[in-house]
């Protein structure tokens, strides 16, 4: 029996832009086999969508609380929905 798949919509606040947070998120997602995307928002936050096995998505969300080496994360907000079948993991502009 395969693990249940999930989709997480994530917003990360703090010093998360200009510190390679998006690229590090992409790399962390690929290491875990998580699909989705990540982008900077005009208000200084980072937004991401993660899809994959629950344990892999949960691991990536936990990673988001620390993020890239130069990041300083103050908050991670997550909501869950049904997966939509995203392919790959991309940085959106």
Curated annotation (Swiss-Prot):
SUPFAM superfamilies: Acylphosphatase/BLUF domain-like. It catalyses: an acyl phosphate + H2O = a carboxylate + phosphate + H(+). One of its GO terms (molecular function) is acylphosphatase activity. It comes from the Archaea. The active site is at 22, 40. Its EC number is 3.6.1.7. Residues 7-93 form the Acylphosphatase-like domain. PANTHER family: ACYLPHOSPHATASE. This is Acylphosphatase. It comes from Haloquadratum walsbyi (strain DSM 16790 / HBSQ001).
